[in-house]
């Protein structure tokens, strides 16, 4: 035990920790040391670096992302977006046409373009209705009337993470289109991380905006066919 060095009373706990078999009853002093080490480990939290929107843009300018990379910034983390399937693409394109019809000069339909919603957040909703196209900058929450997320494989993430961030940013209305259950969820009344009101629409229903006047269409017109044509 001389390898521990120091006086006898100093090296005893060290040697006991190293030599006591895992499945034996540990002496009280070892239990106390182990307990103290466990407390320290619990108190040392793993800290992640959160990129700002400015840093995120500089990464893009530096060529870290290619033009084909589909990424967005959520809570300071660069998140790779899932590939777009035919149902997702069909629904987004159809919604674009349906939302554009009543738009005229009232708002602008933005398709899969970024919004800056916080210092650490730049998501790319599938669609967004903007009051206008801001010059010289990306749209911010004050420019947005509503956002739309079309979900198939990303339902949980879109609902629990992205909609929560839209609510925190104060975006008045957010739609979640669940392609698997063929439903529209219209969320309104943003609060701290959650929308206070939710209205659901399915096949046979007429989808209506909670905040944008005269914005309505039949759900059947926006939901993809059961099987691809051809």
Regions found by a protein language model. Give the residues of each.
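Residue-identity detector for glycine
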Residues: 5-6, 230
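Short N-terminal alpha-helical targeting/association segments
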Residues: 1-2, 118
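Secreted/extracellular small peptides and ectodomain modules produced from precursors
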Residues: 2, 12-13
């Amino acid at each position: 035990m001389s390898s521990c060095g120091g006086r006898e009373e100093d090296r005893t706990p060290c040697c006991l920790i190293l030599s006591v078999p895992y499945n034996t009853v540990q002496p009280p002093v070892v239990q106390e040391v182990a307990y103290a080490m466990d407390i320290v480990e619990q108190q040392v939290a793993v800290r992640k670096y959160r990129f700002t929107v400015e840093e995120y843009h500089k990464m893009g300018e530096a060529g870290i992302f290619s033009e084909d990379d589909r990424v967005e910034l959520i809570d300071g983390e660069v998140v790779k977006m899932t590939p777009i399937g035919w149902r997702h693409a069909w629904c987004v394109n159809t919604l674009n046409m349906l939302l554009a019809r009543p738009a005229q000069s009232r708002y602008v339909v933005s398709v899969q373009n970024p919004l800056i919603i916080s210092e650490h957040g730049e998501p790319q909703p599938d669609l967004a209705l903007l009051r206008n196209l801001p010059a010289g900058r990306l749209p911010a929450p004050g420019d947005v009337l509503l956002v739309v997320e079309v979900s198939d494989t990303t339902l949980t993430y879109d609902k629990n993470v992205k909609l929560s961030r839209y609510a925190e940013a104060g975006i008045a209305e957010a739609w979640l289109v669940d392609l698997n259950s063929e439903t529209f969820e219209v969320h309104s009344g943003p609060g701290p991380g959650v929308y206070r009101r939710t209205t659901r629409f399915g096949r046979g229903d007429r989808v209506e905006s909670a905040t944008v006047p005269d914005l309505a269409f039949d759900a059947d017109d926006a939901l993809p066919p059961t099987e691809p044509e051809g």
